[in-house]
């Protein structure tokens, strides 16, 4: 009886437990919500990073050397740093301050037609900046205009920072020393930023050059610390500073973007020194210590040096230049950048025209063969000849372009004799002088000088000044009317007239037109002369209609 009862209880308990185990659990209570409250939208999917814009496609530095052809320097034009003027905005006075005519599109057309393919435009900036380092807009606009003249005819153009470097302790604010770099780095980088932004959209035919001939604190030429008797520590610091300036230049230009991201850039050795010669063991140090700047793009940096060998002994010149070119290949080209000789000419005094033409033709041809670019320093169309325009040294110009293009090339070389001309002279200052002759005059062969103006000056405005063969020997000639003849007095001057000028005697400047100038030989025959600026004036050749 009990056992049956107990079995029923156990069975009931077992059944109850089983039912409870199989009964589903109540769901958890939901949080109360406000039906009017908006449910936040899920976070948006992150947008993919935009693809970087492709860099412009520019020719490499080596291709630029080939494509630019042979070059010339528009010297003493946009780089004057002392002219007696203080207003850095007045570009015309600065551009003509060192005796050159105002640059024109016609001049660049002439250079192109003669066979030149590139123009280096030296530019000074420090005298054209305000106290905050901002370039005056008037000056930047003029630089831009001259650059456009070059590019308009399909030539290449190089612009730089020029006489902000060099030997002038007062005006050359860029110095190759660690202290100089630390002191002027911000101003230097800010200047290049302004230039780069102005020209960032220009194409591959515009190149930037970092600095011209930067020297150490001792203003040493040839190699760093030369003027100090050589101090290895000073020299090392100077070469490091050159590399630092070059790196700053590349970094700043690249950061401005646009076409500047791949523009071909030129960096110069210390002092633009080329390592030529064997008279000192340190001569090659500027080449050995020059480093290729780090760059975001490959093959868009060129090196630059300058070269002015003596050419009285042509065989010696060729040996020296050949060794120089070998060294440029060894120390610079081997780093992955081509070389341009951004200035070349000669330090020989009064070299023969025959020697100069031989040198010019050989130098350009040999550099071309080696893939080295060349830019002759001035001395082809200078001073008033640019205003025609025509060549002042036509034989040298022809030698240069034939050295590059070959003897079969026929250049267009206009000369002054092709034109009927007058000379427009602008005097700026009291005592300014115009050269009436281009060289000294032997008084044993010549008896006087005669000239004609377009109109008579006022009495006392001008006189002729003749410099004798010694200091203090001077003859003065007064005149009135549109023409004058001055007879030389050997008892006053001696055997030679070193210089003959037309001098201004009034304040406030004056503009005159000289129609012709002739020396009078002892036999009475006339020899034409070409007037030119001596100081304080400019000359523009005006072609007669």
Regions found by a protein language model. Give the residues of each.
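Aromatic-rich peripheral "rim/lid" segments of glycoside hydrolase catalytic domains that contact
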Residues: 351-418
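Active-site mouth of glycoside hydrolases
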Residues: 56-276
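N-terminal low-complexity, Pro/Thr/Ser-rich intrinsically disordered segments
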Residues: 40-67, 416-423
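Sec-dependent bacterial lipoprotein signal peptides
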Residues: 1-20
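Extracellular glycoside hydrolase catalytic/binding regions
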Residues: 91-96, 100, 190-193, 197-205, ...
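Extracellular ligand-binding interfaces
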Residues: 416-496, 505-541
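Bacterial Sec-dependent N-terminal signal peptides
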Residues: 19-55
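Short, solvent-exposed loop/turn segments at secondary-structure junctions
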Residues: 77-79, 126, 164, 213-215, ...
